[in-house]
């Protein structure tokens, strides 16, 4: 039986700072490395065999995957695809999430964070009233 396993990258440096990250290529935090190691250990403990790996182009995702591979003594090639990158946050990129929520309100903040059909512009975040 074919199985699909999805693993989100470990905590990034900007996740730890509560910042919108999107496509900015930030590294894992120390906690993120530990989370990746734990994921690798779970896969090892459950004796899960994986045939093919895909990851985004972002180093936090690649480092999560390579940590998992190392934990399982695997030296396998993996595929990267920009389509697996995190969503692009436009003008919100780099901003503190809590400060942004306080500025634009809870309703608009949730739309920006969770809507799949909302495009964020590269202008001032206050002008991004598209969703």
What are these regions (language model features)?
Residues 121-131:
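Single conserved hydrophobic/aromatic residue that forms the stacking wall/gate
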Residues 12-26:
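Glycine-rich N-terminal loop/short-helix segment of MobA-like nucleotidyltransferase
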Residues 24-38:
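Short catalytic helix/loop segments, enriched in acidic residues and glycine
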Residues 15, 88-89, 130:
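Conserved protein kinase catalytic core
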Residues 1-5:
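Extreme N-terminal starter segment of soluble prokaryotic enzymes
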């Amino acid at each position: 039986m074919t199985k699909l396993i999805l693993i989100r990258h470990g905590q990034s440096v900007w996740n730890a700072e509560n910042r919108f990250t999107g496509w900015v290529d930030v590294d894992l935090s120390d906690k993120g490395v530990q989370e990746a190691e734990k994921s690798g250990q779970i896969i090892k403990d459950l004796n899960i065999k994986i045939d093919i790996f895909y990851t985004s182009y972002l180093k936090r995702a690649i480092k999560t995957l390579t940590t998992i591979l190392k934990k399982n003594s695997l030296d396998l090639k993996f595929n990267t695809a920009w389509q697996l990158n995190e969503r692009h946050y436009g003008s919100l990129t780099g901003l503190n999430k809590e400060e942004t929520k306080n500025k634009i309100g809870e309703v608009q903040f949730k739309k920006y964070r969770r809507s799949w059909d909302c495009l964020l512009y590269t202008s001032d975040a206050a002008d991004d009233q598209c969703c």
